[in-house]
Amino acid sequence: MSDRLVRFPGMSWQEIEALPQPLRWTVQRTIFHLLGEPVPTLADPFPSDDPLPGAYELHLPSDGVTIWYTVTPHEGQEVISIQHVRLDT
């Protein structure tokens, strides 16, 4: 794939904007890095018991936040769709 796009369907962008500022920056920076490496070694297939093709869970333990996203090919591009962002409790 020569090009990648990031989508924020549903409420995912609002979930990011609702985070405290330092975590918001961390999540935004992490999403930016997904453009260079859509499936980093820290990303786990999701759900763990029966993974869906292209679905990942990226847990950032030092920041206490998890990002769920999908990576799918579309017309010669990879589309990274941020599905859900949540603070770990």
Regions found by a protein language model. Name each.
Residues 2-5, 14, 18, 24-25, ...:
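Enriched for short, Lys/Arg-rich terminal
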Residues 32-60:
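A short, surface-exposed loop/turn module that caps and links secondary-structure elements
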